[in-house]
């Protein structure tokens, strides 16, 4: 995969957290699925869920033995972005650093392009 340009980055910190969560669930078939839906205060919302399946057309990114999955419709809004994880005063969460977002809400959960 070194010859292929990956349109989305899956950080080491996020991969490590996913690995921990998968171990807690005791299901090694789980993958982190990232998706975009309409809604939120800025028009689009990021979503994260665990999924055992990879659908036709999904893009997968491997890091530290775990897999990130993105459907083609969501990927078009995430190109050049980075899936990451943070722990802070407001709690812990996965987030996306998205260069395509022209505006984001205060919590970073929704955006517009």
Curated annotation (Swiss-Prot):
This is Iron-sulfur cluster insertion protein ErpA. NCBIfam families: iron-sulfur cluster assembly accessory protein, PRK13623.1. Binds 1 iron-sulfur cluster per subunit. SUPFAM superfamilies: HesB-like domain. Iron-sulfur cluster binds at residues 41, 105, 107. Required for insertion of 4Fe-4S clusters for at least IspG. GO terms for cellular component: cytosol. Its cofactor is iron-sulfur cluster.
């Amino acid at each position: 995969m070194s010859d292929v340009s990956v349109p989305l980055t899956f950080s080491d910190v996020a991969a490590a957290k996913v690995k921990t969560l998968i171990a807690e669930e005791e299901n090694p078939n789980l993958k982190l699925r990232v998706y975009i839906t309409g809604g939120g205060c800025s028009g689009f919302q990021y979503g994260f869920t665990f999924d055992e399946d990879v659908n036709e057309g999904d893009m997968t990114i491997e890091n530290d033995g775990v897999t990130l999955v993105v459907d083609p419709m969501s990927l078009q809004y995430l190109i050049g972005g980075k899936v990451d994880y943070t722990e802070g005063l407001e709690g812990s969460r996965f987030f996306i650093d998205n260069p395509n977002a022209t505006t984001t809400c205060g919590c970073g959960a929704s955006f517009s392009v």
